[in-house]
Amino acid sequence: MLVPVPNAEEVSAENIKESVDAATLNGKLYGYPMTADNGYFMYYNKDYFTEEDVKSLDKMLSVAQAAGKKVAMEFNSGYLYSFFGNTGLKLSLNEDGVTNACNWNDTSGDIRGVDIEEALKRITSNAGFLSCPNGEIADKMKSGEVIAGISGVWDVMNAKEAWGADYGACKLPAYTCAGREVQMASFTGYKMMGVNAYSKNKDWACKLADWMTNEENQKIRFTERNQGPSNINAAASPDIKKVAAIQAVIDQSKYGTLQRVGNSYWDACKSFADTILSGNTGGLSEQELMDVLVDGITASTVK
């Protein structure tokens, strides 16, 4: 149990809204935002891609295919959200805090679930696409097989080692679905500091947490550890814009959603994505496959 932040109004005003939302429950702020870099984006090798190329996944796959290389992501994972998040279809956590609400199998919108499914089949069957575990992308960058990959700040040193001066990072690209360009989405995450409600010195602990997460210390944390600040003033620093990976996180966050999903989401996405990758639907129609995905996402894990 955490202590509500006593100077919540002040802390909220100093940090980006999304980081404050992440630390808020039932209208009360329970954490001091500290970083805003826990997201994912696109790394790319500038020797192969221009800044215009990386705006389009179709173009990136075309470039990779022509070069005999790959654009990589861990497709059979929660990253699947990237293709659904900005289509008008919805995924959310129910009020019980355990189960999910999801309409990814909708048949009535401008973009239907089966439209996304068809786009995913086209993307994953492209010779320039590679699905692999996130932990393997760095090695494939270094081997030369992968010239672009979706990952996070944890891979920044690997990307720099692999591509040197040609290392680049940017927001996720758009992909083609139902005849239109759809900006890929992402889950966003934030680190924060909280105070134990059972602390014998709660007041002093709150003061310490407030100080450790203030503007100056977030700047120091960026300088010494390359961690992206949640503090508005610290994030506006010109030095931030010089670090491609941190700037990519910030740019992608405009198209992201706070990661709040029930546990059933993860296994359902993996199963669906594995089916897409294998091409073996077990005789299910496209709509039936989408229905199975949504049934899995919305299933209760409570025994």
Regions of interest found by a model, annotated:
Residues 99-133:
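Glycine-centered hinge/linker elements that transmit conformational signals in sensory
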